[in-house]
Amino acid sequence: MKRLTILGSTGSIGTQTLDIVRQNPEQLEVFALAAGKNVQEIELQAREFKPRIIGLMEEKAARELKQRVADLDIEVVSGMEGLLRTVTDEVPDTVVTAISGRIGLEPTMEALKVGKDIALANKETLVAGGDLVMGTAQRLGRTILPVDSEHSAIFQCLEEDPRTLDKIILTASGGPFRGWSEEQLQEVTPERALQHPNWAMGAKITIDSATMMNKGLEVIEAHHLFHMEYDQIDVLIHPQSVIHSMVQYCDGSVLAQCGRPDMRLPIQYALTYPTRWPNPFERLDLRGKTLTFFDPEDYDFPALKLAYACGKRGGTLPAVMNAANEVAVHAFLARRVAYLEIIGLVDKVCSEHDVLDATDLETILNADHWARIRTEELIHG
């Protein structure tokens, strides 16, 4: 029996993780759940999965939940302290970091320090603190298994000596606006941007997929997860989202991992590794399908170029880029900035940052804090 703490249990990845638990009650058990403030959803989860601890970031929401589940034997905690409580208890074996944004960095670090393995769906953790997180995991002998479909695909293809690896190829759908003119992009609304052609995801990651910032974040994540230089990480536009990623070896051989665009598959693999479990999910059928690929250079994706540049520069710059992007995306969703302003804001904040070595958590969090304040200042004008 594997016992889980699920951070971000009410979000897209979190609810799909619980679906995997639901399918495998003899192998998986929920020890703790954590979310932001969705009291109604997490109460339903509490009554079904009977966790021992629930953490909510918002204190008011935690108080309400405590009243709602008073008939259950559940400890309700709040804030970052509560979030850390869910990951540092001795009972859970694996922490699923499905929480959105840089906020996942601290609980990931604390979970590693107390000996937990990580099923990582929170790419911002490695973007902001990749060297620190991976160094901690390596030093303590802990495993970080990727949940992102692209990185799970790469992980599944890396069966040989890593010294024979030539490069990795991340695929991207290109989002809903590939090939659109600047005039068309000026009219993009949050509702339109939230209509991803292939994947069902949360709001923030869906906007990131439209701008291609999500792929930029994944490039930085891949750099840390697989210890690859940035010039060994390629991106290909693959609109059908059937091939999730590829690896190329030194002899020219290419291995690709294929599957339906269903996040439950990489989630399950991260929870069952190194074995595989059967499931009732719909299978991939390639009959009649045409698979196409395009160079992202054929389109204007400034976010992808910015992410490569920030990743190569390193230090605190990726954390600043990520923080500025989080603020800008939420401002777009709140109709405070236009779609085309998102990456411009991020670029401006990055250009103003005095980069430091990201050697400790405090330095990273300070850079993150500065970037959020500066982005808000630019939005307010």
Curated annotation (Swiss-Prot):
Binding residues for NADPH: T10, G11, S12, I13, G36, K37, N38, N122, E124, G202
Reactions it catalyzes: 2-C-methyl-D-erythritol 4-phosphate + NADP(+) = 1-deoxy-D-xylulose 5-phosphate + NADPH + H(+)
EC number: 1.1.1.267
Enzyme class per UniProt: oxidoreductase
SUPFAM superfamilies: 1-deoxy-D-xylulose-5-phosphate reductoisomerase, C-terminal domain (SSF69055), Glyceraldehyde-3-phosphate dehydrogenase-like, C-terminal domain (SSF55347), NAD(P)-binding Rossmann-fold domains (SSF51735)
Domain of life, source organism: Bacteria
GO biological process: isopentenyl diphosphate biosynthetic process, methylerythritol 4-phosphate pathway involved in terpenoid biosynthetic process
Residues annotated for 1-deoxy-D-xylulose 5-phosphate binding in this entry: K123, S149, E150, S173, H196, S209, N214, K215, E218
Metal-binding found in the keyword field: yes
Biological pathway: Isoprenoid biosynthesis; isopentenyl diphosphate biosynthesis via DXP pathway; isopentenyl diphosphate from 1-deoxy-D-xylulose 5-phosphate: step 1/6
Cofactor(s) needed for function: Mg(2+); Mn(2+)
Presence of keyword Zinc: no
Binding-site residues for Mn(2+), renumbered to this chain: D148, E150, E218
Keyword terms, alphabetized: Isoprene biosynthesis, Manganese, Metal-binding, NADP, Oxidoreductase
Family matches, as InterPro entries: DXP_reductoisomerase, DXP_reductoisomerase_C, DXP_reductoisomerase_N, DXPR_C, DXPR_C_sf, NAD(P)-bd_dom_sf
GO MF, one example: 1-deoxy-D-xylulose-5-phosphate reductoisomerase activity
NCBIfam families: Dxr, PRK12464.1
Function: Catalyzes the NADPH-dependent rearrangement and reduction of 1-deoxy-D-xylulose-5-phosphate (DXP) to 2-C-methyl-D-erythritol 4-phosphate (MEP).
Protein family according to the UniProt entry: Belongs to the DXR family.
Name of the protein: 1-deoxy-D-xylulose 5-phosphate reductoisomerase
Organism from which the protein derives: Desulfitobacterium hafniense (strain Y51)
Lineage: Bacteria, Bacillati, Bacillota, Clostridia, Eubacteriales
